[in-house]
Swiss-Prot record:
Record's keyword annotation contains ATP-binding: no
GO BP of this protein: rRNA base methylation
Keywords: Cytoplasm, Methyltransferase, rRNA processing, S-adenosyl-L-methionine, Transferase
Chain residues that bind S-adenosyl-L-methionine: G35, G36, H37, D55, F79, D101, Q108
Protein name (record): Ribosomal RNA small subunit methyltransferase H
Source organism of the structure: Cronobacter sakazakii (strain ATCC BAA-894)
A GO-annotated cellular component: cytoplasm
Name of the encoding gene: rsmH
PANTHER family linked to this entry: 12S RRNA N4-METHYLCYTIDINE METHYLTRANSFERASE (PTHR11265:SF0), S-ADENOSYL-METHYLTRANSFERASE MRAW (PTHR11265)
Entry EC no(s): 2.1.1.199
Principal place of residence: cytoplasm
Biological role: Specifically methylates the N4 position of cytidine in position 1402 (C1402) of 16S rRNA.
Length: 313
């Protein structure tokens, strides 16, 4: 079924341009999806170049079979482990660029069987990798009301989190929810004030999805791994799609660009300062999609691209 879902890659050229591709370089596409970024990277690599892709979605792994290129390989797993994948291949410090396209992809959103969207009814799943972990339905059925409320507030910034959590628990007590439509209806009924521009279940679905997939923890680990394995001058290009992701990426790049903070006037020798380490990254700025891209692909509206370069020698 997956071939029925068209995926338009957001900030395609900008994200790949941010990598400053060298024809003989080694690159990582940490979120293969349907291969938009990977194909563009491969088109800019020479015969000696290499591209390692990663994705935890089995459908993405299946889609990658269409790329018959000796310079390309793909790993089925979370991008949080990219540091491990690189070390296993003895490539640490040799990676010239890493691209991460965060969040859920259009094929995942548009396929009702994946359970990511309330727009069409489907199983209440939401897992990036349906072969691992608890589904959204299982977690909501077993979680405490206070924990559900915390997730909705923290990862969905939902102001009616407590009311919605109570309604979810009460509904599951009567008859456990198994469908996306059921969750959307429960949330809508529990929301006293409706936003005329946004479905009342939008924030709840985002929060549950982030929690079920440990998305923010995955991003943090991936960013740390990227800094560890990038070569000096290597680029990190990251696309985020909502404020929680972008704040995390922005904070990480800012902190890694600062280096250790030493109080002014603290007596330290040059050798002691060197032991503390210098800054790991140099932030190169951010880009947002233009009006033409947003008009063609409305899902690009909230996207932000941030690029940084590995420092040191």
């Amino acid at each position: 079924m997956m071939e029925n879902y068209k995926h338009t890659t957001v900030l395609l050229d900008e994200a790949v341009n941010g990598l400053n591709i060298r024809p003989d370089g080694i690159y990582i596409d940490g979120t293969f999806g349907r291969g938009g970024h990977s194909r563009l990277i491969l088109s800019q690599l020479g015969e000696q170049g290499r591209l390692l892709a990663i994705d935890r979605d089995p459908q993405a792994i299946a889609a990658a079979a269409a790329i018959d290129d000796p310079r390309f390989s793909i790993i089925h797993g979370p991008f949080s482990a990219l540091g491990d994948y690189v070390r296993e291949r003895e490539l640490q410090g040799k990676i010239d660029g890493i691209l991460l396209d965060l969040g859920v992809s259009s094929p995942q959103l548009d396929d009702p069987e994946r359970g990511f969207s309330f727009m069409r009814d489907g199983p209440l799943d939401m897992r990036m990798d349906p072969t691992r972990g608890q589904s959204a339905a299982e977690w909501l059925r077993n979680a405490e009301e206070a924990d559900i409320a915390w997730v909705l507030k923290t990862f969905g910034e939902e102001r009616f989190a407590k009311r919605i959590a109570r309604a979810i628990v009460e509904r599951n007590r009567e008859l456990p929810m198994t469908r996306t439509k059921e969750l959307a209806e429960v949330v809508a009924a529990a929301t006293p004030v409706k936003d005329k521009f946004k479905h009342p279940a939008t924030r709840t679905f985002q929060a549950v999805r982030i929690w079920v997939n440990s998305e923010l923890e995955e991003i943090e680990q991936a960013l740390k791994g990227a800094v560890e394995v990038l070569a000096p001058g290597g680029r990190l290009s990251v696309i985020s799609f909502h404020s929680l992701e972008d704040r995390l990426v922005k904070r990480f790049m800012r902190e890694q660009s600062r280096g250790p903070q030493v109080p002014a006037g603290l007596p330290m020798t040059e050798a002691q300062l060197q032991k503390l380490g210098g800054r790991e990254l140099r932030a190169l700025g951010k880009l947002m999609p233009g009006e033409a891209e947003v008009a063609e692909n409305p899902r690009a509206r909230s996207s932000v691209l941030r690029v940084a370069e590995r420092t040191g020698a």
